[in-house]
Amino acid sequence: MSDYKNTLNLPETGFPMRGDLAKREPDMLKRWYEQDLYGIIRTAKKGKKTFILHDGPPYANGNIHIGHSVNKILKDIIVKAKGMSGYDSPYIPGWDCHGLPIELKVEQLIGKPGEKVSAAEFRAACRKYAAEQVEGQKKDFIRLGVLGDWDHPYLTMDFKTEANIIRALSKIIDNAHLHKGAKPVHWCTDCGSSLAEAEVEYYDKTSPSIDVRFNAVDVATVSAKFGAANANGPISLVIWTTTPWTLPANRAISLNAEYNYQLVQVEGECLILAEDLVESVMKRAGIAEWTVLGSCKGSDLELLRFNHPFMGFDVPAILGDHVTLDAGTGAVHTAPGHGPDDFVIGQKYGLEVANPVGPNGCYLAGTYPTLDGLFVFKANDVIVELLREKGALLKVEKLVHSYPCCWRHKTPIIFRATPQWFISMDQKGLRKQSLEEIKGVQWIPDWGQARIETMVANRPDWCISRQRTWGVPMSLFVHKETEALHPRSTELMEEVAKRVEQDGIQAWWDLDPAEILGADAADYVKVPDTLDVWFDSGSTHSSVVDARPEFGGHSPDMYLEGSDQHRGWFMSSLMIATAMKGKAPYRQVLTHGFTVDGQGRKMSKSIGNTISPQDVMNKLGGDILRLWVASTDYTGEIAVSDEILKRSADSYRRIRNTARFLLANLNGFDPALHQVKPEEMVVVDRWAVGRAQAAQAEIMEAYENYDFHLVVQRLMQFCSVEMGSFYLDIIKDRQYTAKGDSVARRSCQTALFHIAEALVRWMAPIMSFTADEIWNEMPGERPQYVFTEEWYDGLFGLAGDESMNDTFWAELLKVRGEVNKVLEQARSDKRIGGSLEAAVTLFATPELAARLNSLQDELRFVLLTSAAKVADYADAGDDALQSELISGLKITFNKADGEKCPRCWHYTQDIGLVAEHAELCGRCVTNVAGDGEERKYA
């Protein structure tokens, strides 16, 4: 028996079946870096239309976690896809480098500034620590396959950026948005500093819930308001609070003007309560019997006076819309120094903004004899007892409620009025203008717009000052007496900025005011405050994007971060850009959800359900992590577990196997020499290229809409269904057995070449490492990297008016599927081994029969059987199986006649007709010794 193996066109490629990504990817990264891939892309894209995705800077502290990976991979997919769409999309990664977390880490290492080290030494240590953290995170981000200018990232602690942050504040001052005031701000007693809204988290806390009597100063006047002449005993207005520690700062009681209030007689006294809450208060206080003596509106009680229960002065009743009937008594204890609503209503009534609490959370001396020096949360119980002694406590309970806490320390925070600098939301119309700007931005998902609109509409003025050591100085001079800003503030700030640009922020603390103030130095002092770090990152659209030449003066197109950044970076950037330039800093804002485990639980070290991106890359590879990110609908929670990653690895293998089949069967194909013209190609080959064209249109649209999970779904469908289970299956016979340089084979290779050219580009933004690997195995002259390319424009399809158009092949796929069911059952019943042992008969209605017969003898190649014939539907016997999908089709099969050809494995009756090749079928003889078979359709 002759060996005809060397007459076959067997697949051959250097592209391995196993990805072995964890081992191969680091070598690719080394090559990318040594060859300056990022620089090559920039050169290739120069002069194209620009798309700027501005990187929201992660904080330079600690290792990257799985959430960081999601964020950076999504950004990288977009940047690479934009490159494929013909954009120049420079990507400059950044880091947020100032602020408290770094201070706390450095304190642990060298102690607090002013104790063991000077402030200057402390800042230098912070700078060094932040730089080390940046380097550690940078390595992990690069390992993800993220392309960017990693050698020249932006750091908020770069001298030039620090200087530009000062210039941003100067512009805001120039536009009259800055003011100073003693306002209640979120204050962490552990940090000893005010907190931005984005630095506040909410956790459950148990607090005392108390109802407190404020006795009326003039009982007769109050009784008269209710029309009650028969009131017995003292009259008190009852407030409800869960923060007894704020009572020393009480300066009023707020009522709602429109609510009805009742004077209620109980044993020995009268209580004033909101009509709708009387029953709940009585139940809470354990009072079974009461009598309503009269009613009046809240507005009738305005400015009546009530005695503070222990501070020795009286306070007015005032009116405010913030009073609700959700809980309590309908009367709200009002301390303008300890709450934003209280402050606003206090301003309206000219109330004192009292703040008896120091930065450490302890009462100042002179507050109250038993409270001086006491920590506020410890004072709650002392105040409850004090109220009990004074006869002012109506009821005390414990309440578990959601309470604001410091994001770093996880400890409860307080509202505390301190002298601070604010960007005003309303004095120059910043709120109104910001709300207008929001409308011009595309929010992805679209619910992001309503979310940030609500936040902007309701947010207080932004407290931008901090009492910290490691931060950008506000760089302000104020008058010693009046505390007014120096009239030449913007000019002076530019002088400071120039010094900072040379020497960093330490230049401010080293500055002798006389150097730039001259004679004014006698009357003005430096403001010691630093800027909120959210101002640092929020101004990068100006301090970085406007300043770096590679952005070419273009403003950012997109900001992309987690959904918590509506109140963080998106908000601070919007406020600063609108205050500086009168416009939003972005055109599109895309948000992604948070990572959770396979059961939907938040990632937590205590639960033990965290997944380290480093571990995933070391075990499975970066492309598996990237494919997982792309496969997930990032608009909601993003689930990750070992099982989910295993599914991503399975999907990856299917895609890789498809790519490997394409490459292996392009062996010996030179596109410059061997391409077949579309009109001369076998019809099914043109159909396959057309399916790639249709897939590409959908994939390009999905990339354009940032629907990466749809990209992956379409890619998988193309590889598994249209290619894997149909086209790649039926071409094996022609590809392997046809004459090597025949049109039949070269037509097939031409199709595979076009498909591979398209496929590698579809993959590149997501599976970047594998796309690069495929690109290097592709035949023909080509640029060095796929990442410099655009979507493949060499695809073509079948004409719609051809008889064998897409509709024809879609029907044929169904027919083949129905035949496969019959053959699968036969295999299961051990009646045949492989499908080539079968000869099938398709009983079809006339129209379907005509379409099937148009394939002539090549129908069998589509069905992967040794023989196939079409008969009249009416002639089908009882043994014919009715198709479930196609009403006009019945199927039977028999064992194929003849012998098995050892070369093509088809069963045929023409083996041995040519003496020189006595073992071969006639078709194989033609392919081995003749001109080669002709194929028209399949």
From Swiss-Prot:
Q: Which GO terms describe its biological process?
A: isoleucyl-tRNA aminoacylation
The reaction(s) catalysed by this protein are: tRNA(Ile) + L-isoleucine + ATP = L-isoleucyl-tRNA(Ile) + AMP + diphosphate
Positions with a binding annotation for ATP:
K605
Which cofactors, by name?
Zn(2+)
Could you tell me the EC number(s) of this protein?
A: 6.1.1.5
- Keyword flag Protein biosynthesis: yes
On the tree of life, the source organism's domain of life is Bacteria
| Details of cofactor binding | Binds 1 zinc ion per subunit.
Record Gene3D superfamilies:
1.10.730.20, HUPs, Valyl/Leucyl/Isoleucyl-tRNA synthetase, editing domain
Cite the entry's keywords alphabetically. Aminoacyl-tRNA synthetase, ATP-binding, Cytoplasm, Ligase, Metal-binding, Nucleotide-binding, Protein biosynthesis, Zinc
Q: Which residues bind Zn(2+)?
A: C901, C904, C921, C924
Query: What stretch of residues is annotated with the motif 'KMSKS' region?
Result: 602-606
Please name the top-level EC class of this enzyme.
Answer: ligase
**GO cellular component terms attached to this protein's record:** cytosol
Q: Does the keyword RNA-binding apply?
A: no
The UniProt annotation puts motif 'HIGH' region at 58-68
Which compartment or compartments is the protein found in?
Answer: Cytoplasm
Task: Specify which residues bind L-isoleucyl-5'-AMP according to the UniProt entry for this protein.
Answer: E561
A Pfam family annotated for this chain is zf-FPG_IleRS
NCBIfam families cross-referenced by the UniProt entry? ileS
Q: What's written under domain?
A: IleRS has two distinct active sites: one for aminoacylation and one for editing. The misactivated valine is translocated from the active site to the editing site, which sterically excludes the correctly activated isoleucine. The single editing site contains two valyl binding pockets, one specific for each substrate (Val-AMP or Val-tRNA(Ile)).
Partners and quaternary state?
Monomer.
Purpose: Catalyzes the attachment of isoleucine to tRNA(Ile). As IleRS can inadvertently accommodate and process structurally similar amino acids such as valine, to avoid such errors it has two additional distinct tRNA(Ile)-dependent editing activities. One activity is designated as 'pretransfer' editing and involves the hydrolysis of activated Val-AMP. The other activity is designated 'posttransfer' editing and involves deacylation of mischarged Val-tRNA(Ile).
What family is this? Belongs to the class-I aminoacyl-tRNA synthetase family. IleS type 1 subfamily.
Protein name per the record: Isoleucine--tRNA ligase
Source organism per UniProt: Yersinia enterocolitica serotype O:8 / biotype 1B (strain NCTC 13174 / 8081)
User: Which gene underlies this protein?
Assistant: ileS
